[in-house]
């Protein structure tokens, strides 16, 4: 068994720092807000020193997230409005060619897919459902949550949605509009992924991951490096976490939640995408993306490609072995075909 002693020392230091904050905040830590650290962020990428690999599609603005939907054969990219109250935009790139731009009914904070031809975007008071084939968006209000600032969203295998909020609550819906269970144990919910009907919540302020069972109740919670920033699930049931501050790729199993692998990835790892063959990680300080084979028990680098500037968002099409790299500075969408190649 491999022991990542450097990562262990860093995680212990982060944990001790959080414990010190907790001691100073309140004499009753059970009722105090969760202790937090400054959330990790991607590096400010320099201009690319090398021509990006593959093809480049134009896309301006400051895109925030991307998914690939196999049923509709399209890449969906979320770009926030120019201010927090402005409507967001969802840009759809079809594999068959052509681009459509859909202005959403309001601001959107996070994007999720389900492989069912739809996209789901969190917003204040609820979420939007987008039919990716028709290019139509439907707002959905969640009962009694009109003033809730939802910040994260994911779809379970049974079709139920899990959302998170800025005040640190995770909501498991019982129907399209009603809450079946909610737990308020986080500083903030920054990302959610699902594996079957279980969910995993990322809290950047606590640099932690927490499992929710099919009833929406919290299960195991683990520290995630020195500054976990992003999270993705892969087809093998693994949860990938980029420890941007600690310079690591963390790999978790879900049931139960357990850290299975920790591997050093320098240059501010941030963007993530899971695929059948490789785990993809972008290095924002270097404008690079790396594909790792996780099947040996320790990540093994198989391929790497130069990217567009600020490669914060990744998405992958397993059917065509195509990697999409989205620039967060308006440098476009990079399309790398046969990305995994002959391994």
Model-assigned labels for residue ranges:
Residues 2-10, 19-343:
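Predominantly soluble domains enriched in secretory-pathway, periplasmic, or organellar proteins
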Residues 13-14:
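Long, low-complexity, charge-rich intrinsically disordered regions
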């Amino acid at each position: 068994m491999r022991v990542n002693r450097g990562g262990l020392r860093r995680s212990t230091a982060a944990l001790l720092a959080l414990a010190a904050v907790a001691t100073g905040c309140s004499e009753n830590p059970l009722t105090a807000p969760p202790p937090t650290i400054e959330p990790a962020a991607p590096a400010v990428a320099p201009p690319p020193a090398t021509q990006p690999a593959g093809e480049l599609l134009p896309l301006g603005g400051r895109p925030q997230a991307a998914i690939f939907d196999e049923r509709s054969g399209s890449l969906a990219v979320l770009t926030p409005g120019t201010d927090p109250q402005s409507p967001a935009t969802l840009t759809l790139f079809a594999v068959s060619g052509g681009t459509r731009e859909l202005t959403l009914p309001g601001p959107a904070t996070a994007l999720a897919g389900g492989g069912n031809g739809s996209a789901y975007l969190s917003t204040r008071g609820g979420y939007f459902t987008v039919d990716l084939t028709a290019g139509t968006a439907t707002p959905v209000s969640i009962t009694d949550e009109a003033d809730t600032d939802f910040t994260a969203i994911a779809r379970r295998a049974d079709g139920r949605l899990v959302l998170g909020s800025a005040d640190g609550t995770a909501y498991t819906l019982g129907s399209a509009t009603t809450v079946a269970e909610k737990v308020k144990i986080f500083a903030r919910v920054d990302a959610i992924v699902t594996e079957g009907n279980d969910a995993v919540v990322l809290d950047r302020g606590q640099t932690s991951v927490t499992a929710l069972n099919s009833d929406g109740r919290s299960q195991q919670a683990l520290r995630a490096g020195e500054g976990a920033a992003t999270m993705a699930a892969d087809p093998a049931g693994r949860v990938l976490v980029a420890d941007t501050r600690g310079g690591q790729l963390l790999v978790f199993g879900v049931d139960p939640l357990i850290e299975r692998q920790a591997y050093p990835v320098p240059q501010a790892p941030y963007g993530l995408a899971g695929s059948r063959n490789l785990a993809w990680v972008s290095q924002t300080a270097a404008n690079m993306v790396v594909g790792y084979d996780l099947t040996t028990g320790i990540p093994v680098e198989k391929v790497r490609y130069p990217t567009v500037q600020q490669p914060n968002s990744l998405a992958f099409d397993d059917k065509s072995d195509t990697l999409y790299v989205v620039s967060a500075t308006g440098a476009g969408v990079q399309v790398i075909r046969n990305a995994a190649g002959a391994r």
